[in-house]
């Protein structure tokens, strides 16, 4: 999933355009790189990347949970969210969750994934010069933060648990099985 998400992201960013936005409080214009307003193909690629990164993070956390001697006997269902499991894994492995530079971006990734999957908040366009929320969510700045947060989670937690995380550098060969 991580490989697929990263590939979708590479295809998406190649199609990004400069999108005018403005600061709501002041009206000062600025530009973001994001999918075009009606570019369904690029928006779909961004959605696939976001979903893939979220699934990759959740899958890795579940694997880490089963690998960690302090958690593998605990029913993971007692933790209602992936973030809850991450916090507990950090705690039992002497990782200061509060100091992790990627934690807010990872939370934002899961919030975006939830809004895409469960569609509880309608996508709206507010104002004349403001970029819609989805263009802001899928901006290159935010997408790079989401991607980095997943890779950092895997590297930080995986290394602490002596897991092979070499695939985060783009070498996915270990996942292929030949008969």
Put a short name on every predicted segment.
Residues 3, 36-51, 73, 100-107, ...:
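Short, solvent-exposed segments of well-ordered alpha helices
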Residues 57-61, 113-120, 154:
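A structural signal for well-ordered alpha-helices, especially hydrophobic packing surfaces
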Residues 102-129:
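Histidine-centered, metal-coordinating catalytic motifs and their short helical/loop contexts
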Residues 127-179:
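Amphipathic, Lys/Arg-enriched alpha-helical patches that create a basic surface
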